[in-house]
Amino acid sequence: MIITRVKALNWRNLRKVSVPLERRVFAVGPNAGGKSNFLDIFRFLREIAVRGGGLYSAVQKRGGVGSLQCRAGVEDGFEIAVTLGDENRPDLWAYEIGVQRCGSGRKYPILKYERVFKNGEKIVDRPDELDRSDPIRLEQTFLENGTANAAFRPLVTFFAEMVCHSWAPSGMGAYPWMGDLAEFFGNEPARAFLRDIMAVPETVRRNRIEKIEAVLQLVVPQFKRLNLAELNGNRVRLETMFEHWRPGEKLPQEQFSEGTLRLISILWALLSSESVLLLEEPELSLHPSVVRHLPGLIYRLKRKQPGQTILTTHSPELLADEGIDAQEVVLFLPDEEGGASIMPASELREAQALIDAGLSVGEVVLPRSQASRVEELGFYQ
């Protein structure tokens, strides 16, 4: 199951968007064009659905409803709608939520509405009679309420299992993995990465590490082996061995290059995610020759397992892959008022004709994604 369409109204700089999504999605646009805000739609839904989350915390950590809505003082609140399905039926599920401010000083988020559809049939429609008789119920979604979401639990699980990969790996140390791991979630991404590795059964962990090891042997000169070592004090860390290194001596993760650590974490995320995986500029710190193969690598690693990959990129090398279809690329087009619209690259005039003529998707969309005055940098003094 994947997200087949996402809609947003008054969300950050996305005033009104509705865009279809494929199993792979490449989000392309200028700096501050709305790509991260687009990914944050999925993070927001995840943070409502995940255990220990909820509407209030998801809104407040983003500065409140006023910080999230695009046009403060014009329209109160924001709205999000996602449709989920598969190849046979693209609308198996749909979830819609509208949020506005309420309370003293209008500080608290409450529901304008919450709706769930299953196979086109509406199974949740709030506010209902109980909400109208007790408005405080609108401070909590059914999505976060385990006693109220039994009828759409697969949707809850799907949202809760979405993963965002955007961390910078520098400063990654050995990880104390025994005890309460939940405290690390969302606060220290590098430690959360090691936590994720330790959370899976040993046979699965070893299998994934061997696959990552095989990729590293192809792209990192003289690379020989990747291992997860347990240290004293219930700590673990990644270690590598190189052909040119001192015989038998292992290089700890603190001494890995940033590109190596980033590639390891991206590969682990691709192998482990079965819901939506969000990758923010995966090309960072990677050699262009590696970046060129990322789209194909994503396709091959994900083709035999469920899930969807949505990534943002500025990279011509990544978008040069001939296997990328124009329908997989969504283009962010800022307007003069600070907002942005989104459209599939396949809807660009003459896009398919240019691709059929031999241009890559990147050559078609990247010139349209640059800032309107960027050429003036050549005259800046």
Residue ranges and their predicted role:
Residues W11, P30, P282:
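P-loop (Walker A) phosphate-binding loop of NTP-binding proteins
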Residues Q217-L271, V276-S289:
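Conserved ABC ATPase signature
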Residues R23-R62, L263-S272, G296-L297, T312, ...:
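Phosphate-binding glycine-rich loops of NTP-binding sites
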Residues G73, N88, A269-S272, R300-Q305, ...:
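Conserved catalytic network of the ASCE P-loop NTPase/AAA+ motor domain
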Residues M1-R15:
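N-terminal pre-Walker A segment at the start of P-loop NTPase domains
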Residues D40-G105:
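Conserved P-loop NTP-binding catalytic core
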Residues H293-Q381:
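C-terminal lobe/lid and adjacent interdomain/linker elements of RecA-like ASCE P-loop ATPase modules
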Residues N88-N227:
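Electropositive, glycine-dotted interaction segments
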